[in-house]
């Protein structure tokens, strides 16, 4: 038995105090995102990336990459700033073999020292998708166990993460800021203001290798069962979850704060 002597008894937090603390945390994070957007107004994508990696969140952020059609542009910039920044790839078990090959090519070319593959929990697959066709029956749940949950686990302990999203990709991303407050972290979008022509110019200027499926009409490349080539007048993400009432996998659609 141990004795506390004259120490005051511990005060357990009440539900109200916890709610207040959470609200304060959210407000502080939203304020930080607003400050970063003001700080990065007029900055180039490389300047935003360099500032985030070396000044604002040194050692406390990760890059999340799909290794899709445009991925080489952001990854090239990251390699110019730091080859040691963690590069997270969500390996759903449903990717095109071409994407896995492309991932290995880019990681080797850019010399990243901390590239990680995030996989779903085997227990979740056994429970929810033992036959491997959950994508056709419940695509939201499939994305949840294969993408959202593995990423959330990998981001524990980090303060920020970097994405390659751009405003031109869909109408839902038209107002995409450089910094967002989301799920207790800052999400950074250095390429938010880029257009498709700038992406193509970067590929040519830096002689970046194309995704093997790009020339087949794939512009947004996710899991093989849920991705198709796009038509001439479709936006770049029209080939994702075609025929379903779904446009995002879920890693970017949690409640903004």
Residue ranges of each PLM-predicted region?
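Nucleotide-activated chemistry modules centered on ATP-dependent adenylation/adenylyltransferase
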Residues: 2-257
């Amino acid at each position: 038995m141990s004795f506390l002597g004259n120490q005051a008894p511990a005060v357990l937090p009440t539900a109200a105090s916890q709610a207040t603390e959470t609200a304060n945390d959210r407000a502080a994070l939203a304020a930080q995102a607003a400050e970063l957007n003001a700080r990065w107004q007029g900055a180039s994508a490389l300047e935003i990336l360099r500032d985030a990696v070396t000044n604002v969140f040194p050692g406390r952020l990760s890059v999340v990459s799909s290794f899709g059609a445009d991925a080489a542009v952001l990854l090239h910039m990251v390699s110019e700033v730091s080859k040691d920044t963690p590069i997270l790839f969500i390996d759903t078990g449903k990717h095109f073999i071409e994407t896995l090959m492309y991932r290995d090519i880019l990681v080797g070319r850019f010399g990243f020292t901390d590239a990680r593959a995030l996989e779903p929990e085997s227990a979740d697959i056994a429970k929810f998708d033992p036959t491997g066709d959950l994508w056709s029956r419940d695509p939201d749940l499939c994305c949840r166990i294969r993408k959202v949950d593995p990423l959330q686990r990998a981001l524990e302990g980090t303060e920020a993460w970097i994405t390659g999203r751009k405003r031109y990709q869909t109408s839902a991303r038209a107002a995409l800021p450089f910094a967002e407050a989301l799920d207790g972290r800052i999400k950074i979008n250095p390429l938010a203001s880029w257009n498709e022509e700038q992406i193509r110019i970067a590929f040519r200027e830096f002689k970046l290798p194309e995704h093997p499926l790009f020339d087949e009409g794939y512009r947004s490349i996710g899991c093989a069962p849920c991705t198709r080539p796009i038509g001439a007048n479709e936006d770049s993400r029209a080939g994702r979850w075609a025929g379903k009432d779904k446009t995002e996998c879920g890693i970017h659609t949690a409640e903004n704060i």
